[in-house]
Swiss-Prot record:
UniProt-listed Enzyme Commission number(s): 2.7.1.130
Lineage: Bacteria, Pseudomonadati, Pseudomonadota, Gammaproteobacteria, Cardiobacteriales
GO molecular function terms attached to this record: ATP binding; tetraacyldisaccharide 4'-kinase activity
Alphabetically ordered keywords of this record: ATP-binding, Kinase, Lipid A biosynthesis, Lipid biosynthesis, Lipid metabolism, Nucleotide-binding, Transferase
UniProt KW Transferase keyword: yes
Keyword Lipid metabolism in annotation: yes
Official protein name in the record: Tetraacyldisaccharide 4'-kinase
Organism per entry: Dichelobacter nodosus (strain VCS1703A)
Name of the gene encoding the protein in the UniProt record: lpxK
One annotated Gene Ontology cellular component of this protein: plasma membrane
InterPro entries registered for this protein in UniProt: LpxK, P-loop_NTPase
Protein family: Belongs to the LpxK family.
Pathway annotation from the record: Glycolipid biosynthesis; lipid IV(A) biosynthesis; lipid IV(A) from (3R)-3-hydroxytetradecanoyl-[acyl-carrier-protein] and UDP-N-acetyl-alpha-D-glucosamine: step 6/6
Reaction(s) the record says it catalyses: a lipid A disaccharide + ATP = a lipid IVA + ADP + H(+)
Length: 335
């Protein structure tokens, strides 16, 4: 079962019904907040360049970060100067921060650091999206388009294109809002969804009308921390241990099992949790399997442990029609 997702978020049962009154209060507060923005009682910000929001309507583990990375790389290949803004979950900062190769993951957060490492795009981190954008454009005025990592529920930011990321194996859960379900806001979402992107094919229809695209992993390659590729056969010659701190670790474990890999021990920590060498004493005789998101938190590990890190690629395929849709939205709204 999901470590960070209560089982009753998957389908309705007595636990979800007991919590439903709290969900109705949460739902009412969100709807009130929506209406205040819709009426202009609370002001919203429109950036001077197009903004593409990649977000979700359920809590955690929807594959946003690999999707953001794939979109940035695809847009860069077409010649666009792309910047990224992120709240930076797991980080600690009091003002907007630009991510660079030497950034401390404890300050900027694991996802922004990973996005920068995989794309080399400028990434500005702050919980107030307007200030994050202003900081980004002040240092990189040549930026032509901004991707917001998460932010569908950040109503203070106007957008030009909204992409909804959904995990095919979870969908929208039981359809209830927090805490009885996983929904972060009532359906339909406040944002006008321009496209839905799922990691794998959905088994049920979604109650949201928008073009749907399916992404898959490009490959199942494993790499050492220095980027050297390592074969599955070589992996299986060693004791293998999993260390991960992601929202839905069973998805990572299922990929490993599908490749015929059975770890001796799987140590699973809370999403965004920092990883330290002191946690690894059980794995001294083998190799440590982790995700790319986990690897960015090993920057201060000793050479002994760095040499044991093995990362499974999470690079996604991107439909060319999705890129065309994004650019169409961005250019249409800015004419």
């Amino acid at each position: 079962m999901l470590r960070d997702i209560p089982f009753f978020w998957r389908k309705r049962c007595w636990q979800s019904w007991v919590l439903l009154p709290l969900s109705l209060i949460f739902r009412a507060l969100v709807l009130l907040r929506r209406q205040l923005y819709r009426l202009g009682v609370i002001a919203s910000y429109r950036a001077p360049v197009p903004v593409i929001v990649v977000g979700n309507v359920t809590v955690g583990g929807n594959g946003k970060t690999p999707l953001v990375i794939a979109l940035v790389n695809a847009l860069q290949e077409k010649g666009w100067k792309v910047g990224v803004i992120s709240r930076g979950y797991g980080g600690n900062r009091r003002k907007p921060v630009l991510v660079n190769e030497k950034s401390d993951v404890r300050t900027v957060g694991d996802e922004p650091l990973l996005i920068h490492q995989k794309t080399r795009a400028p990434v500005s981190v702050y919980y107030r999206r307007q200030r994050a954008i202003e900081n980004l454009l002040m240092h990189f005025p040549e930026t032509e388009l901004i991707i917001s990592d998460d932010g569908l529920q950040h109503y203070a930011l106007q957008y030009d294109c909204a992409l909804l990321a959904i995990a095919a194996d979870f969908g929208l859960g039981n359809g209830f809002c927090l805490p009885a379900g996983a929904l972060r806001e009532p359906l339909p979402p406040f944002a006008t969804i321009d496209a839905i992107i799922t990691t794998g094919k959905m088994s049920t229809a979604l109650p949201i009308s928008a073009p749907q695209f399916v992404t898959t992993f490009k490959n199942d390659q494993f790499y050492r921390s220095n980027g050297e590729r390592i074969s599955i056969e070589t992996l299986k010659e060693n004791p293998l241990y999993v260390v991960t701190a992601i929202a839905r670790p069973e998805r990572f474990l299922n990929r490993l099992h599908a490749l015929g890999i059975s770890p001796v021990i799987s140590k699973i920590f809370a999403d965004h949790a920092m990883l330290h060498e002191s946690m690894l004493t059980f794995a001294a005789d083998g190799l440590i399997l982790m995700t790319t998101k986990d690897q960015v938190k090993t920057q201060n590990w000793s050479a002994f442990w760095q040499e044991k890190i093995i990362v499974l690629s999470d690079e996604l395929t991107i439909d060319e029609e999705l890129i065309s849709l994004i650019l169409s939205c961005a250019t249409r709204t800015r004419k």
